Amino acid sequence: MRNQSSLSDRLTVEVDCSSLGSNECPSMTSSFSPLESPTPTPTSIYSQGSLESPGWHGAGSLPNNTYERTPGSASMRSAFRLAGMASTESLGLPYGSMEGQERMPMPDFLSGYDENIEQLWMPSEAPKSYDHVAQGLAYHQGMHQYPTMARNTNNNYRHQAAAYLPESTTNPCLSRSIFHQPERVPSSMSSSMSMNNMLPWMNLGDSIAPQTIAPSQVGPVTPPPSYTDFPTSLSAFKQHSPTTPIRSCSLGTGSGADTPLSRLSGGPCEYMDDFQPSPVYRDGFQRPHRVASRKMLRRQTSKQNLMLENLPQVIKQVQFKCKEPGCNGRFKRQEHLKRHMKSHSKEKPHVCWVPGCHRAFSRSDNLNAHYTKTHSKRGGRNRYVATLDENSPDYDPEFRGQLTPDGRPIYGSKLDDPIPGAGDMSLDGWDE
């Protein structure tokens, strides 16, 4: 190494401009931006206390770290090596084949970089080899405990998984890939970020689960001695209750533990007063009592309805009753009562015409039932009449005359004509 007496001895740059045109070789003595030059530029790590902004023509002193140059006519992309890496960790990023407009500046993602420096770009084909020597450059305090990241050998970053920087609780912005960022989070917001926003960026081991917080960390949550010690009454609490769930205070706020008493008495969540209570939430405390009272009322009314005096009359009081002593006949219509009264009278005008029967009925319908049930069946006690049997070929309900011994009609005869051989037969002889 050279003596570190002057900046020109410490930062000596050799640029091979033989393969470049006159317009493509920048002058290192003049200030230029790496954005405008296709020539690869040196890459280094700057911290807030060890290095200053790399103005190429006027930079600060580097007391412990120097840049070595490789003698010869090699190109600049292989001429720089950082001779001060204190650890054995390597830094490899899939930044090779990205277009110029797709590249993002490194200071936007690494808080260890100075925001005032000129934006440096990772060269597309630079080997990025470093010497791991004992004398090294101390890391910034916000960038400690970085694990080793494997170098991406494939130049096409689109076909490889993005290399993620290690997760850290001090700077949540470093937990995401620097190339696949849906949105940027400035590093200055890391100190003011609440615990709710910190949880997605933390490791499983570093994150604090809400159910594992010790009671001593949250603070005592003890109910008051009585309900009268509440700062507000229950009705006031229901009036100030919002219609939608309230986001509870974050764990990272400095207001202290979030307890149910603090929500009741106000505090950081006093904006709930702006909400109007909904009818469903307002009646939530009275609904169970109201439903219980309705159930009790229904039970009482059902018991009262089962009592005999409260039961409705199944048989309605009819207007037409039979006046015969000992008869409890009741009827809905007057004609029904008249028909019933004929059964009590001694007059029976309806007589069976079948020879040998001569049974009389007070009602015609009873006589017809007698014909159907008595004389139309074979083998009965009464005489069988074929003209009254619907299944017989001699069926004729209008026939009135003499019958043969087997019950078949004798056409042309009359009821008054004597039956042949009837003198030798009795009434029991008709029974078969």
Swiss-Prot record:
Listed Polar residues bias regions: 62-72, 238-252
Bias-annotated ranges (Low complexity): 29-44
Q: Which UniProt keywords apply?
A: Activator, Conidiation, DNA-binding, Metal-binding, Nucleus, Repeat, Sporulation, Transcription, Transcription regulation, Zinc, Zinc-finger
This entry's comment on induction and repression of expression is: Expression is induced during conidiation, after conidiophore stalks had formed and had begun to vesiculate. Positively regulated by abaA. Negatively regulated by velC. Expression is also controlled by acoD.
Task: Mark the C2H2-type zinc finger spans by residue number.
Answer: 320-344, 350-375
Give GO BP annotations, semicolon-separated: autolysis; conidium formation; positive regulation of conidium formation; regulation of secondary metabolite biosynthetic process; regulation of sterigmatocystin biosynthetic process; regulation of transcription by RNA polymerase II; response to starvation; sporocarp development involved in asexual reproduction
Annotated GO molecular function terms are: cis-regulatory region sequence-specific DNA binding; DNA-binding transcription factor activity; DNA-binding transcription factor activity, RNA polymerase II-specific; zinc ion binding
Result of altering C357S: Fails to induce either the asexual reproductive pathway or the expression of development-specific genes
Give the UniProt entry's GO cellular component terms: nucleus
Q: Does the keyword Methyltransferase apply?
A: no
Record's superkingdom? Eukaryota
Name of the protein this chain belongs to: C2H2 type master regulator of conidiophore development brlA
* Source organism of this protein record: Emericella nidulans (strain FGSC A4 / ATCC 38163 / CBS 112.46 / NRRL 194 / M139) (Aspergillus nidulans)
Question: What's the name of its gene?
Answer: brlA
